[in-house]
Amino acid sequence: MLTIRSAKPQDAEALLAIYAPYVTDTAITFEYDVPTAEEFRSRIENTLKKYPYLVAEKDDRILGYAYAGVFKGRAAYDHCVETSIYVEQSCQGMGIGKILYNALEEVLKQQGILNVNACISWIDTPNEYLTHQSPDFHAHMGYEKVAHFHLCGYKFNITQPS
């Protein structure tokens, strides 16, 4: 049975194992280098000071995680967040992301968050680094496109339109 729980700093290595292929093989994240376990641990700790950071676990194995963070660094944005979600690539399409996001959104609602944003990479013609899987997932979850930043990211010697 899949369980959702709050992430702990000691989950860093398991979460990093899920995240690393997104860094090295995709333009889903614009991060170029895989962070160290210590850096990832620090990210978890910093996020948990204010926002939820959830993991999906089955049989003591973490299969995915989702968290919220600062949308913009100004006080007027305090009731808005940016979300991120990563599911182990071999487990995609199994409903884990939907369960994680539903749980994350419930916690955010309890915290008084009014606006949940997902900043998603987009490319008109999918390639080996970027597909429409994330935008399609977010649309399925009820997210609506509200902006488009043109030629905003550069990774793998390709300008990603974002």
Predicted regions and their residues:
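Conserved acetyl-CoA-binding loop-helix of GNAT-fold acetyltransferases
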Residues: 93-106, 132-136, 140
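A short beta-loop-alpha structural element at the N-terminal edge
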Residues: 3-15
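Short hydrophobic/aromatic beta-strand or adjacent loop that forms the aromatic wall/cage
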Residues: 51, 160-162
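Helix-loop element at the rim of GNAT/NAT acetyltransferase active sites that forms part
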Residues: 17-34, 47
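Conserved GNAT acetyl-CoA-binding A-motif
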Residues: 108-130
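Conserved catalytic-core motifs of GNAT/GCN5-like acyltransferases
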Residues: 119-121, 135, 139-159
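Short aromatic/hydrophobic contact patches that present stacked aromatics
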Residues: 3, 82-86, 117-119
